């Protein structure tokens, strides 16, 4: 298992009262905050959105914002700014979100509604070509024959950014645990760029800004290659990344060696967090300066984990990738 970084004081005022939810620092890192909706908020939200099945959210995209407004109204309109503030804050940028009373696979549709509401308070989730919807649900089992590491249980899924092989801006990534059976291990792995001890070395390398080709396997349903550098800067000139080791295609020896060394430097970082995510909870991270992955599982013939993801853009910020949008 990867090492945890030391717990430090967090800027969040744990004594502040919020309406409908709590917000506290996590045990893993001062950069990761835990937001929990109260049982009453959860119950009222599900009652007020019950008239819309998930299919309605799929077909009518404006309803995704409607359910977001319902959730924010239940939280006295404190929720939206308190989601955006840490997500746009370089010192934080990550939330672990939970709703009391949503914790069973039988509530999978309710989980999708909740995650959709949260995501559409900060921006809009992009079309996911793998699923054909604005979200994707997928299952990890003990045996896998797919064409990427996404569903392979017995190895580490290396740290990466999402949205590397599409042209849409991918500011945020949301990853929700829908089901888990006969499961040991498989924690989420996170690395904040500013906690990566080799950032300066690789960010200043001549290849850091060279556009490289990114190509996805057939399961992603994306046939067009995209070109962009591994590193870029935000509006304030700070490093951001668009990187995944599986899909970047080096054109020559120089690029291949550099990418291999970069991968090793990321995977061996002492700043990696190992974060358990129970059923019903989800991580929401700033994709520009957080890398994410997954630790390996302990083998079991009936192992099963179901996940849901959404990824999209912030509607309230302009500091995307500055040179290669």
Swiss-Prot record:
Pfam families: CsiD (PF08943). Pathway: Amino-acid degradation. GO terms for biological process: L-lysine catabolic process. SUPFAM superfamilies: Clavaminate synthase-like (SSF51197). Its EC number is 1.14.11.64. GO terms for molecular function: ferrous iron binding; glutarate dioxygenase activity; oxidoreductase activity, acting on paired donors, with incorporation or reduction of molecular oxygen, with 2-oxoglutarate as one donor, and the other dehydrogenated. It catalyses: glutarate + 2-oxoglutarate + O2 = (S)-2-hydroxyglutarate + succinate + CO2. CDD domains: CAS_like (cd00250). It comes from the Bacteria. Its cofactor is Fe(2+). Keywords: Dioxygenase, Iron, Metal-binding, Oxidoreductase. InterPro entries: GlaH, TauD-like_sf. Fe cation binds at residues 160, 162, 292. Binds 1 Fe(2+) ion per subunit. Homotetramer. Belongs to the glutarate hydroxylase family. Acts as an alpha-ketoglutarate-dependent dioxygenase catalyzing hydroxylation of glutarate (GA) to L-2-hydroxyglutarate (L2HG). Functions in a L-lysine degradation pathway that proceeds via cadaverine, glutarate and L-2-hydroxyglutarate. This is Glutarate 2-hydroxylase. It comes from Shigella boydii serotype 18 (strain CDC 3083-94 / BS512).
């Amino acid at each position: 298992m990867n090492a945890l970084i030391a717990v430090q004081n967090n800027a969040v005022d744990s004594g502040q009262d919020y309406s409908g939810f709590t917000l506290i620092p996590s045990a893993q890192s001062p950069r990761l905050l835990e937001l929990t909706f109260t049982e009453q908020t959860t119950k009222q939200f599900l009652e007020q959105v019950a008239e819309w099945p998930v299919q309605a959210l799929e077909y009518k995209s404006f309803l995704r914002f409607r359910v977001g407004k319902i959730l924010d109204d239940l939280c006295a309109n404190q929720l939206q700014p308190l989601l955006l503030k840490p997500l746009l804050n370089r010192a934080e940028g990550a939330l672990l979100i939970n709703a009391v009373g949503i914790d069973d696979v039988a509530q999978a549709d309710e989980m999708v509604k909740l995650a959709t509401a949260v995501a559409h308070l900060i921006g809009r989730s992009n079309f996911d070509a793998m699923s054909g919807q604005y979200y994707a649900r997928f299952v990890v089992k003990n045996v896998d024959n797919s064409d990427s590491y996404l569903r392979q249980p017995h190895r580490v899924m290396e740290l990466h950014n999402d949205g590397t092989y599409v042209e849409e801006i991918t500011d945020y990534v949301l990853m929700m645990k829908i089901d888990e059976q006969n499961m040991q291990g498989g924690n989420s792995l996170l690395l904040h760029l500013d906690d990566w001890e080799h950032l300066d070395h690789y960010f200043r390398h001549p290849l850091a800004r060279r556009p490289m080709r990114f190509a996805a396997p057939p399961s992603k349903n994306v046939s067009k290659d995209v070109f962009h550098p591994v590193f870029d800067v935000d509006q304030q000139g700070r490093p951001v990344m668009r990187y995944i080791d599986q899909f970047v295609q080096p054109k020559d020896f120089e690029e291949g060696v550099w990418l291999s060394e970069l991968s090793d430097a990321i995977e061996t970082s002492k700043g990696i967090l190992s974060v358990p995510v129970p059923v019903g909870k989800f991580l929401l991270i700033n994709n520009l300066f957080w890398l994410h992955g997954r630790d390996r599982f302990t083998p079991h013939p009936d192992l099963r984990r179901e996940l849901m993801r959404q990824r999209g853009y912030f509607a309230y910020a302009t500091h995307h990738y500055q040179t290669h949008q």
